[in-house]
Swiss-Prot record:
Protein name in UniProt: Orotate phosphoribosyltransferase
Pathway: Pyrimidine metabolism; UMP biosynthesis via de novo pathway; UMP from orotate: step 1/2
GO molecular function, one term: magnesium ion binding
Cofactors (names): Mg(2+)
Reactions it catalyzes: orotidine 5'-phosphate + diphosphate = orotate + 5-phospho-alpha-D-ribose 1-diphosphate
Listed Gene3D superfamilies: 3.40.50.2020
Subunit structure: Homodimer.
CDD domains recorded: PRTases_typeI
Domain of life: Bacteria
Gene name in the database record: pyrE
Positions that bind orotate: T126, R154
Family the entry assigns: Belongs to the purine/pyrimidine phosphoribosyltransferase family. PyrE subfamily.
Length: 182
């Protein structure tokens, strides 16, 4: 395990794993919660997120990254900054849960993604519902989705659902076993 990946894993274990009954965004109940906003919005951990996810997706060709607000927003920003630090141009975008009823009435915010190759990201994935919603929205906006990447996969079917439903590769940096969770 390289230093950056190991450092991020330790940050997640120390700051983001919360034990106790919780209801997840998927509606499922769990005995633990991985609150990755404690990582993706943390000044020490967020840069590690960007580096780890760029390394994880290094073989995919994309020039924009984003996903469904809110979980994906700081992940995309971390990747944008990590890419810039490496001398690479990478734009970020935000997918709203619904199009705005005013202004430009856009569902996908940020630089134009029509005709571009994009990576959809998420902080943690349970059923794959949020990334699939984002994939559908960015395809409607005219982008080509090259993959989906998440920081933590809960090993509850997201990988299979995304690969079958969206027809794109699914990557994750850590699984629940690496976090010591059942």
């Amino acid at each position: 395990m390289d230093d950056v990946r190991g450092a991020l894993l330790q940050q997640i274990k120390d700051k983001a794993v919360v034990h106790g009954k919780v209801t997840l965004s998927s509606g499922l109940e769990a005995d633990y919660y991985v609150d990755l906003r404690r990582i993706t919005l943390d000044g020490e951990a967020a840069p590690l997120v960007g580096q780890v996810l760029l390394d994880l997706t290094a073989d995919l060709d994309f020039d924009a990254v984003g996903g469904l607000t809110m979980g994906a927003d700081p992940v995309a920003a971390a990747m944008l900054h990590a890419a810039a630090a490496r001398g690479r141009r990478l734009d970020a975008f935000v997918v709203r849960k619904a199009a705005k009823a005013h202004g430009l009435q856009r569902r996908v915010e940020g630089p134009e993604i029509k005709g571009r190759r994009v990576l959809v990201v998420e902080d943690t994935s349970t059923t794959g519902g949020s990334p699939l919603t984002a994939v559908e929205a960015v395809r409607e906006a005219g982008a080509e989705v090259v993959g989906v990447a998440t920081i933590v996969d809960r090993a509850t079917g997201a990988a299979e659902k995304i690969e079958a439903g969206a027809g794109v590769p699914y990557r994750f940096a850590y699984d629940k076993d690496e976090l010591g969770l059942d």
